[in-house]
């Protein structure tokens, strides 16, 4: 069952301006080490950061909190599954909020799509609650 949906659309030039104006301070405040390594290695660095920024905004909306109520930028990070599909990795207050949302006997799956077409970057997040299979030998 779907328990959260969020989307965000951002102007890449806004992130480009923040990178130029605030540099490392902006990057280190908003992005995880994995995101920094991934984005800094890209040809279009600003677009890469913009997609990840939009993903964080979309995820915070799917959590139902926005960037408030104990949910912070660096607690939501874009990571890739072994096949390359992007998803969100949550820690701290973001992970706690996700646990609060989950019905008993369910686990979360976070679906993420990110894209860019200059000057825009977009992200869409769906949080799904999936039933956990009972352990063998239990009733």
From Swiss-Prot:
Keyword annotations from UniProtKB, A to Z: Cytoplasm, Fatty acid biosynthesis, Fatty acid metabolism, Lipid biosynthesis, Lipid metabolism, Magnesium, Metal-binding, Transferase
One GO cellular component, as annotated: cytoplasm
Family: Belongs to the P-Pant transferase superfamily. AcpS family.
Protein name, per record: Holo-[acyl-carrier-protein] synthase
Reactions mediated catalytically: apo-[ACP] + CoA = holo-[ACP] + adenosine 3',5'-bisphosphate + H(+)
Reported function: Transfers the 4'-phosphopantetheine moiety from coenzyme A to a Ser of acyl-carrier-protein.
Enzyme class: transferase
GO molecular function, one term: magnesium ion binding
Any GO BP: fatty acid biosynthetic process
EC number: 2.7.8.7
